[in-house]
């Protein structure tokens, strides 16, 4: 079980980016293929994960491996996905494209970008996909498939509850979710890091998806505002939304992100607002687990995350209704994981931290302000301790990038 769960492959020398290039081809094919659940899943995951994984591997070729690298790549990929869409939406009208955030223009942009990234992988002999998969036994895939079952049961249970008022399957899904949380603590010393993280991630998705999928309407006190802004972006097919003075319209997590998922992957807006927050919250919990595991060990970290999941009302009942905050919280947890990793090359980590700061700034204003304040305080604390700058990730330029991005985007651009 431990071998199946550990996600720390060694980098293979002499590769020519074969696995990564093949993965880019699969994503490109899924983009142009007729809409189906399989194609939607592959294209959605691939558009965010593959570019982020390649860029992360090029910037930090060593020091960060396995699941930590996968989470970091997801954060970088979300940031890139948002900024590419924003650039396309803003520049397109000046090139004569009236609706640049519609399917055909976005397909052209992303197919060209995917081809360029695949070429970079070949030229630089970078194969992050191959590195990630190297040395993993087949039973790892079985664990991944098994842990995907409880979230699916949660969706089936919600559907049955909506249609027949029977809560049998929904109750079973809840029991499974709580059981996974318990297993992550009870068996923390007998399973590997990856499997423990898998238990936590599957549990969060299973429990969170139980709430917004029930009933025939979107759920949440602020969901009307989020939905209207996202729908206006999709209707306009461009960014910024013409003649809009709504501050929410400046958040790429509510405008460009759902618009691209809708047009590129044929995913309905309601589906995006219902399912994506649960996945992001699961990623937050997993990232938190891996970050504090270095300090508290497998049992202490699992217990603390379990308390976060089942002991915090807002985590399961309030945050799933705030997609913009879920995006920002995930990026912030990745920043904390990144700056607290003692194995990562410090200078290159500073670059990735600054990039994630940009992603925070365009995702959620309040989280961006608080994150910037936390980074500035941490930088000042490092000065008080007189730690040499070469040993500090949060230097003055990094702190300035967080604060500057939050202030400029929140107060000027938006």
Stretch-by-stretch model annotation:
Residues 1-192:
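Membrane-embedded, hydrophobic transmembrane alpha-helices
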Residues 44, 48, 174-177, 281, ...:
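Hydrophobic core segments of transmembrane alpha-helices in multi-pass, intramembrane catalytic enzymes
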Residues 226-229, 387, 399-414:
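Transmembrane-lumen/periplasm boundary regions of multi-pass, lipid-linked membrane glycan transferases
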Residues 161-167, 184-330:
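Active-site lumenal/periplasmic loops and adjacent helix-entry segments of GT-C-fold
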Residues 332-349:
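Membrane-interface transmembrane helices that cradle and orient dolichyl/undecaprenyl
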Residues 156, 338, 350-365:
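Membrane-interface alpha helices of multi-pass inner-membrane proteins
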